[in-house]
């Protein structure tokens, strides 16, 4: 497994360095790395994010072995993030963490990658692949860099991501209930109760489990969920609604 990862990293590095040569035009002047970097910073400060990205990219292509190149890669990713080019930012950051796993700003690279997916989170009615990527990325930041300044914000955002993922399950579960398919609905609500029990959707998920089980005639099962709802959320509105269901 380690050999496979190492081989993959070598391939990434080789492709990245090979592309440096292909990106350079025959008649393109090689500009000093520091000059390109300063130009990128100037464009960034002026709000010209795509132009800034292009300048930082030149550092990588023209000076792949320069000491400032890793920082230019990060700044290129940041410029793309600000420009709303999140997929491109993620691609740059994926290469960065392969090339520079021990860089002093490696925590920021993982954090910015997670943010690039986080900002693409869509409505619960739509595909949630970016939400799942954000979830994985934020968890990785917390796991790898628990003492970093990014871990705190990652934890806060992770709560919101989990709430969003729970919302997706609730949306699908309610749909199944509306179609009189309580068996399929139960599977969705159980995911919320078991995997997202700290989110704001947990009380309603328990209520919907009561409702779904009653539709199936499983009164004892419904009462079990009612007990959990009453114990965990005694003052919640969904607990009060459940009382009416079981009368």
How should each PLM-predicted stretch be described?
Residues 9-16:
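Bacterial N-terminal signal peptides
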């Amino acid at each position: 497994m380690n050999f496979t990862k190492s081989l993959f990293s070598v391939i990434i590095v080789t492709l990245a360095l090979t592309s440096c040569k292909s990106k350079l035009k025959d008649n393109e002047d090689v500009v000093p790395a520091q000059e390109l970097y300063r130009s990128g910073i100037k464009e960034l400060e002026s709000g010209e994010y795509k132009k800034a990205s292009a300048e930082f990219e030149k550092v990588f292509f023209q000076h792949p072995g320069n000491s400032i190149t890793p920082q230019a890669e990060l700044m290129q990713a940041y410029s793309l993030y600000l420009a709303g080019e999140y997929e491109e930012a993620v691609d740059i950051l994926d290469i960065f963490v392969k090339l520079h796993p021990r860089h002093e700003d490696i925590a920021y690279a993982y954090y910015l990658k997670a943010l690039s997916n986080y900002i693409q989170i869509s409505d619960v009615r739509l595909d949630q692949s970016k939400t799942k990527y954000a979830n994985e990325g934020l968890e990785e930041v917390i796991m790898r860099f628990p003492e970093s300044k990014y871990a705190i914000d990652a934890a806060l955002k992770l709560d919101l991501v989990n709430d969003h993922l729970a919302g997706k399950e609730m949306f699908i579960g309610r749909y199944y209930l509306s179609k009189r398919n309580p068996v399929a609905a139960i599977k969705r609500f159980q995911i919320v109760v078991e995997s997202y029990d700290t989110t704001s959707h947990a009380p309603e998920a328990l209520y919907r489990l009561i409702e779904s089980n009653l539709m199936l005639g499983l009164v004892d099962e419904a009462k079990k969920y009612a007990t959990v709802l009453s114990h965990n959320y005694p003052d919640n509105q969904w607990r009060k609604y459940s009382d009416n269901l079981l009368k």
